[in-house]
């Protein structure tokens, strides 16, 4: 399974890239706004660090304007993927862009019906939001299972990007289901490292090594 980082912060991206565990990056207008830098400049900077898919979201709501904005973003770097919200205009724009071989990540997906429409329109990626579904007492991971099954049934070429990931168990569950990709905030990625038995083991090894050195002086 691929892991994308859900951020527009360069330091977070550089750190995760140095760990060798990320395959791409997803951004959205909210994440970019936190950085107080020009949008296109930041997307270009991210592409220079990560040689994998980098999702950049359009802000237009009309399909014509979405296409115009998407084409400008696609010119930034060959790795840019256009992020488009799941709307009727978004579907129309996705159809046009996919026919021109511009990769689309259809976002804000909350049902298997929406995912099916996105894939029919030609989306390269579909991004179901598991955490937000869990927030309203729905089952986010059940949605992932359904989309995986639809892709298997009809051999769609789209990949699932599990989004709105809140904790490591979301990631593990997605991997067990067979999702292609998870996109995670930096703090969630960091929490994947943690296990109390690992810390206890390191402390014990270091204590034993120090005792050994003291005995053999």
Swiss-Prot record:
| Pathway recorded for this protein | Carbohydrate degradation; pentose phosphate pathway; D-glyceraldehyde 3-phosphate and beta-D-fructose 6-phosphate from D-ribose 5-phosphate and D-xylulose 5-phosphate (non-oxidative stage): step 2/3
Q: Which GO terms describe its molecular function?
A: aldehyde-lyase activity; transaldolase activity
- The EC number(s) attached to this protein equal 2.2.1.2
Which keywords describe this protein according to UniProt? Cytoplasm, Pentose shunt, Schiff base, Transferase
Q: Write the protein's name.
A: Probable transaldolase
Q: Tell me the function of this protein.
A: Transaldolase is important for the balance of metabolites in the pentose-phosphate pathway.
Say which family it is in. Belongs to the transaldolase family. Type 3B subfamily.
Classification lineage: Bacteria, Thermotogati, Thermotogota, Thermotogae, Thermotogales
Report the subcellular localization.
Cytoplasm
SUPFAM superfamilies membership: Aldolase
One matching Pfam family: TAL_FSA
Task: Quote the InterPro entries the UniProt record gives.
Answer: Aldolase_TIM (IPR013785), TAL/FSA (IPR001585), Transaldolase_3B (IPR022999), Transaldolase_3B/F6P_aldolase (IPR004731), Transaldolase_AS (IPR018225), TSA/FSA_arc/bac (IPR033919)
Could you say which enzyme class this protein belongs to? transferase
Judging by the UniProt lineage, the source's domain of life is: Bacteria
Write out the catalysed reaction: D-sedoheptulose 7-phosphate + D-glyceraldehyde 3-phosphate = D-erythrose 4-phosphate + beta-D-fructose 6-phosphate
- Please name the gene that encodes this protein: tal
- Oxidoreductase found in the keyword field: no
* CC annotations in GO: cytoplasm
> One of this protein's GO BP terms?
pentose-phosphate shunt
Report the active site residues. 83
Q: Which organism is the protein's source?
A: Pseudothermotoga lettingae (strain ATCC BAA-301 / DSM 14385 / NBRC 107922 / TMO) (Thermotoga lettingae)
């Amino acid at each position: 399974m691929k892991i994308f980082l859900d951020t527009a912060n360069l330091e977070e991206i550089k750190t995760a890239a140095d760990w060798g565990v990320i395959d791409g990056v997803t951004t959205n207008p909210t994440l970019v706004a936190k950085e107080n830098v020009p949008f296109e400049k930041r997307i270009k900077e991210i592409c220079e660090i990560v040689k994998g898919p980098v999702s950049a979201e359009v802000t237009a709501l009309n399909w014509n304007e979405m296409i115009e904005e998407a084409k400008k973003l696609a010119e930034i770097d060959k790795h840019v993927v256009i992020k488009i919200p799941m709307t009727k205009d978004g579907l129309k724009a996705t159809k046009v862009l996919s026919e021109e071989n511009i990769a689309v990540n259809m976002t804000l997906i909350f049902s298997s019906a929406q995912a099916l429409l996105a894939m029919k329109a030609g989306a390269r990626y579909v991004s179901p939001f598991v955490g937000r579904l869990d927030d309203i007492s729905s089952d986010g991971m059940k949605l992932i299972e359904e989309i995986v099954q639809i892709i298997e049934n009809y051999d769609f070429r789209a990949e699932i990007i599990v989004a709105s990931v809140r904790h490591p168990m979301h990631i593990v569950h997605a991997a067990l289901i067979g999702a292609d990709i998870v996109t995670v905030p930096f703090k969630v990625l960091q929490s994947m490292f943690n296990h109390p038995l690992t810390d206890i083991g390191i402390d014990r090894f270091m204590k034993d090594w120090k005792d050994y050195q003291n005995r053999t002086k």
